[in-house]
Amino acid sequence: MSLSGLGDTGKAQPPPALFPAPESDTPTPGRRRGGAPQNGSSQGGPSHDGPPQNGSAQTGPPRTGDEGRQLVFFGADAAEPTVADLAGLLAGPGEVVRMGGTARLSVQVDAAWRVHVLVAELASRGLAASWEPTEGERHAVRTSYTRVLKPLAAAWLHGTTKRPPAAFHLTGRRLRLWLAAAGTPEPPDGFLLRLGPDDQECWESIGVALGAAGLAGTLLGPGEGGPAYRITGRRRLARLAELVGGPPIATPPHAWPT
């Protein structure tokens, strides 16, 4: 989908400068990893144990430094980023709302590093994002209202209820976004992909899509530490790592499958 001439993404303002950007690797020519290359340098790094500190906001996608990885069919490295990838956020706790002929995407996350990654991922798709702290040391990341997101909203919304489209499937880039927003390791050999607490109508279809991607998981209800799908076993975790690609620079150690 062409992003030129659609919506107001070019006029959107970058996130407030209250969030230190991680140091970036020296850019190298070649295939983009998770989006367009960063320009310039950034200062400091995010606090992984608390809310963002004063600093400059990251506006470009992080580089993973894993250019030697072999591409996996349907993996995050196998295609350029598109707006359709944002369905991965809606598979998790992301929300989309419509206003007139436009739509806005938002997601609440539980750690500062996730803000870095999501702002960069949205920027790589031509969507400027803002963020703000919320209750419980969480952060809300959201786009502006834009016509670019109207097809995504039309596919996922039935009235105001979020529901996956009939042909929904999970690619590496969709999984990468879901994991960046709401993926949590569960040692020694598990990984949780968290769901929207009010999205019960989505859970079964999301589980089917995970199974089709080779990531059949166990649905955990709210009383079991969820809602989330638990992915277990070395083979499935290796498959997850292949599909989502290497960790973004802002990711804390052990927070990403490898």
List the model feature ranges, each with a label.
Residues M1-T258:
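Internal intein/HINT superfamily modules and their associated LAGLIDADG
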